[in-house]
């Protein structure tokens, strides 16, 4: 009967019925769908519609449906205004009465002016929990975790976005990401509509955790463009704290180990299960999750109410078997891969560009004098700038600079002005930490030397090293009270800021600690291996097992990951470790090379017996030499284009970094001899500008001419500057997709015009403007052997285009010019047309996607009548029409050397196509005219089926 009444009301204007009658007719519908009675009672009390006695009567009802019926009885008995207010509460508190949204929409309820003035209090558990989460995340993300615990930096004042790049499944560049909001939107960079995980990856220290902290801060303050009502943040390394016997329900994981609802947790969890799309999860550092727990022994799916091991819950959350539809943002270091079916987007963090670095310097040093002093020192040392491209290292260097300013107030604080290694940076920050408790006023200035500082802090450093080594050995990054006590760390040591305390996360109570960054743990691990006299040479070198030869199985890794492909949607646990990233081992090796370098011996002799130091140094060098020979010999080689090409892998970059840390010319010469090729391919290795310092250190000893391919990396202008020692021997220089600006091109111009040996210059997809185009033109003018020039997808307009075209016209060696994806327009096209006339060498020209109209097309067609060298011209994605087609048809009746004419995605119709087809009757040289994507209908294209050289579809 009541159900019939409900349907009877559908589509009937509310004004025709009283509010009391509406509640009567829909009584059972309301009884069924109202879950939260307390919120109704609270609002009726707040506005004086219910007395305390009314509230007690409702509370005395034994079941929720009985409570709803009693509220309805009381509301209806109090008249129209109270009934209308009752409906107003249902309308305003959408989360509390989500099941009534459709019904409220159907009845077209609109409150009167009187009712709109009434106060609505939201005591709904779901809404309260959202506010609780916002408060907690806002508090947790307010301060940037600083390397000295006594200092807190406001995140709002120190955070800066880094270069964020959308990439495809195979890490191909899809363009830059506009900002953090774009991470979660549904229109930018989506690879898989069914995927739920946004995967953010990048090298250690590039800012992944800071990005998540900023995301939390924005969500907590309501500034994030997201509909998420719940935000759960987990650090993957914390899951390593759980024992194999630990069992948790999903509700316990979310509430007891993150944030427990202040009221009605069952109601909150029920809402989350019903509407998982209202939740956003962030999982930080998947590569830092290591456990012996075997997920292959447990079912693929699990029930949200049944207890399971926390790693099972994590795996099923990531795979979507739990809370399917919830948004997930996952971070990991470069090298970790996630199954495609889970991915929604992939975002690569690139670190600071030169402009980011200068902006960050201004933010960290608002005082003008200090700011200018710092920037002058950075400009004088590209090597230091390259290190600062990694936000973590930049922050450490800047904080050390600030410390020197404070300690030596009134004097000029100075950053190193020579080659700086990562070991130098971490020794510096160690010295700063240890000197924090020392007097720093002008009256009591601390004058201890670095050696004295380290000697005074020997006990602390050794204890920290013991903690770090124990964790690194097991790939663990969180330490309990027992590990800290076993190393004899004292309370004062913990206050120095190397270790920071964490909130309780495991099932057992007790304080946990972590180093402020993985790289610091690696540094102290290396320090322990060098300084502890009980460490054997075998143990000293054990992390070098990560230096596997290309093609070797990864089973020799120091520690295998707990994760299997099965848990994330793959088929088998067997085979290579899907999470091969072992940067903590690689950084340990790097710091070992740095600490045992000749330059550090005087410092370390204060701490380590001379004989032990000599023995360890000898063992490291012997192993380093043997590893280098073996690895370089095993690199894949191929004969291509007249070159003996060697394709280096990312491990080769780690070797270069270790060699650079030694600052040993002997090791550099050995590595250079081992290359044994004249073409070194380092494309897609995620090399950064600092790696160019290491590469130059080795190639400086390579005395033959060399082709160098560094396409698709992250070098920027600082990287180009660091390559300066190499340019005297580089004949092929491929620097495409590297964030290079006009500043970097200027360096190239200055260097390449000195030696004039370059034959190939690749600068595709950078940030070069007309200014840089002029430098490129100068290179082409002065380097008479330059044959291949790739300048596509930059920011070059007609002015820059004319400069390049003039240089092409004057060149007798150039054979291939790529200008795709610029904006040279008709003026630029006319300049290239002039260059084409009677050109002696040019065979391939791409002017695709350049805004060229029929006017520019006509000039090019006319010029080709006077050209006998060009065989390929690409004019794809311009604005050419039938008039242009007619001009090219006339050209084809004269030109008998052109082989490929690409006019794809222009505005040519069947009429223009017919003219081109007729011209082919008098041209036997051309092999194809590509017209795909023009204004030609399929039925019109059939006319040209017999002419195989016309390609319409």
Swiss-Prot record:
Gene Ontology terms describing biological process: apoptotic process; cellular response to muramyl dipeptide; defense response to bacterium; defense response to Gram-negative bacterium; defense response to Gram-positive bacterium; detection of bacterium; ERK1 and ERK2 cascade; innate immune response
Localization: Cell membrane; Apical cell membrane; Basolateral cell membrane; Cytoplasm
Record-linked Pfam families: CARD, LRR_6, NACHT, NLRC4_HD2, NOD2_WH
Keyword Cytoplasm: yes
Membrane topology: Lipid-anchor
Sequence positions that bind ATP: 202-209
Domain CARD, chain residue ranges per copy: 15-107
Function as written in the Swiss-Prot or TrEMBL entry: Pattern recognition receptor (PRR) that detects bacterial peptidoglycan fragments and other danger signals and thus participates in both innate and adaptive immune responses. Specifically recognizes and binds gamma-D-glutamyl-meso-diaminopimelic acid (iE-DAP), a dipeptide present in peptidoglycan of Gram-negative bacteria. Preferentially binds iE-DAP in tetrapeptide-containing muropeptides (MurNAc-TetraDAP or TetraDAP). Ligand binding triggers oligomerization that facilitates the binding and subsequent activation of the proximal adapter receptor-interacting RIPK2.
Similarity remark: Belongs to the NOD1-NOD2 family.
Name the record gives this protein: Nucleotide-binding oligomerization domain-containing protein 1
Organism for this UniProt entry: Mus musculus (Mouse)
Protein encoded by which gene: Nod1
């Amino acid at each position: 009967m009541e159900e019939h009444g409900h349907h009877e009301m559908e589509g009937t204007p509310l004004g025709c019925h009283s509010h009391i009658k509406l509640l009567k007719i829909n009584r059972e519908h309301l009884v069924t769908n109202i879950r939260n009675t307390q919120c109704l009672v609270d609002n009726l009390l707040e506005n004086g519609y219910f007395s305390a006695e009314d509230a007690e009567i409702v509370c005395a009802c034994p079941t929720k449906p009985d409570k709803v019926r009693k509220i309805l009885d009381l509301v209806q008995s109090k008249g129209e205004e109270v009934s209308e207010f009752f409906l107003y509460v249902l309308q305003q508190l959408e989360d509390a009465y989500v099941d009534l949204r459709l019904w409220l929409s159907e009845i077209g309820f609109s409150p009167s002016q009187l009712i709109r003035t009434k106060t609505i209090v939201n005591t709904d558990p779901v809404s309260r929990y959202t506010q609780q989460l916002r408060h907690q995340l806002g508090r947790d993300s307010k301060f940037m975790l600083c390397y000295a615990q006594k200092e807190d930096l406001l995140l709002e004042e120190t955070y800066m976005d880094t270069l964020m790049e959308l990439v495809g499944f195979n890490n191909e560049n899809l363009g830059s990401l506009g900002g953090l909001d774009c991470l979660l939107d549904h229109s930018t960079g989506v690879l898989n509509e069914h995927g739920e995980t946004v995967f953010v990856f990048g090298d250690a220290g590039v800012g992944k955790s800071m990005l998540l902290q900023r995301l939390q801060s924005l969500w907590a303050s309501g500034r994030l463009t997201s509909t998420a009502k719940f935000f759960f943040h987990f650090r993957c390394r914390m899951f390593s704290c759980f024992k194999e016997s630990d069992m948790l329900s999903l509700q316990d994981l979310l509430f007891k180990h993150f944030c427990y609802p202040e009221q009605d947790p069952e109601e909150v969890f029920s809402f989350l299960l019903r509407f998982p799309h209202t939740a956003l999860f962030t999982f930080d550092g998947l590569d830092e999750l290591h456990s012996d727990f075997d997920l292959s022994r447990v079912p693929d799916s699990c029930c949200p109410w049944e207890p399971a091991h926390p790693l099972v819950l994590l795996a099923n959350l990531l795979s979507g078997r739990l809370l399917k539809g919830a948004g997930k943002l996952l971070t990991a270091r470069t090298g970790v891969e996630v199954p495609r079916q889970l991915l929604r987007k992939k975002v690569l963090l690139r670190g600071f560009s030169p402009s980011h670095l200068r902006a960050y310097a201004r933010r960290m040093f608002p005082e003008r004098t200090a700011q200018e002093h710092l920037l002058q020192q950075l400009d004088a040392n590209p090597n230091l700038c390259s290190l600062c491209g990694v936000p973590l290292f930049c922050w450490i260097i800047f904080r050390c600079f600030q410390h020197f300013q404070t300690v030596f107030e009134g004097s000029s604080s100075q950053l190193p002005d020579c080659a700086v290694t990562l070991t130098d940076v971490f020794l510096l920050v160690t010295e700063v930490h240890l000197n924090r408790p020392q007097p720093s006023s002008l009256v009591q200035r601390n004058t201890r030397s670095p050696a004295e500082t380290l000697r005074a802090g020997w006990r602390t450093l050794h204890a920290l090293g013991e903690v770090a080594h124990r964790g690194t050995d097991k790939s663990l990054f969180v330490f309990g009270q027992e590990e800290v006590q076993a190393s004899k760390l004292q309370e004062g040591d913990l206050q120095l800021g190397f270790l920071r305390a964490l909130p309780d996360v495991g099932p057992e109570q007790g304080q946990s600690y972590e180093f402020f960054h993985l790289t610091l743990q690696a540094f102290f691990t290396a320090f322990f291996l060098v300084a502890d006299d009980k460490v054997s040479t075998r143990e000293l070198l054990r992390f070098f097992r990560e230096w596997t030869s290309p093609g070797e199985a990864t089973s020799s890794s120091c520690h295998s990951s707990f994760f299997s492909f099965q848990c994330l949607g793959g088929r088998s646990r067997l085979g290579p470790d899907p999470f091969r990233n072992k940067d903590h081992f690689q950084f340990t090796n790097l710091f070992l090379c740095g600490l045992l370098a000749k330059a550090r011996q005087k410092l370390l002799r204060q701490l380590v017996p001379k004989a032990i130091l000599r023995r360890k140094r000898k063992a490291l060098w012997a192993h380093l030499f043997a590893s280098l020979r073996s690895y370089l010999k095993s690199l894949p080689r191929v004969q291509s284009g007249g070159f003996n090409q060697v394709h280096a892998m990312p491990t080769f970059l780690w070797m270069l970094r270790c060699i650079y840390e030694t600052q040993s010319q002997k090791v550099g010469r050995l590595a250079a001899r081992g290359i044994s090729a004249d073409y070194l391919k380092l494309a897609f290795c995620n090399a950064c500008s600092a790696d160019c310092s290491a590469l130059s250190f080795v190639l400086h000893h390579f005395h033959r001419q060399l082709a160098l391919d560094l396409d698709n990396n992250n070098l920027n202008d600082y990287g180009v500057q660091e390559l300066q020692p190499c340019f005297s021997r580089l004949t092929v220089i491929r620097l495409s997709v590297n964030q290079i600006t006009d500043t970097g091109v200027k360096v190239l111009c200055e260097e390449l015009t000195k030696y004039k040996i370059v034959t190939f210059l690749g600068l595709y997809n950078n940030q070069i403007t007309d200014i840089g185009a002029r430098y490129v033109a100068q290179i082409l003018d002065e380097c008479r052997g330059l044959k291949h020039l790739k300048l596509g997808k930059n920011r070059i307009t007609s002015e820059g285009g004319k400069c390049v075209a003039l240089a092409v016209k004057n060149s007798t060696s150039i054979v291939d010019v790529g200008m795709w994806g610029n904006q040279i327009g008709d003026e630029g096209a006319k300049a290239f047309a002039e260059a084409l006339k009677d050109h002696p060498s040019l065979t391939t020209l791409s002017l695709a996607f350049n805004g060229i109209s029929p006017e520019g097309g006509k000039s090019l067609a006319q010029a080709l009548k006077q050209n006998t060298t060009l065989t390929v011209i690409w004019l794809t994605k311009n604005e050419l029409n039938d008039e242009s087609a007619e001009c090219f048809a006339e050209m084809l009746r004269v030109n008998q050397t052109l082989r490929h004419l690409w006019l794809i995605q222009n505005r040519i119709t069947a009429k223009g196509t017919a003219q081109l087809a007729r011209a082919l009757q008098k041209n036997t040289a051309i092999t194809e005219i590509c017209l795909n994507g023009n204004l030609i209908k399929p039925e019109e294209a059939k006319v040209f089926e017999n002419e195989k050289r016309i390609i319409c579809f």
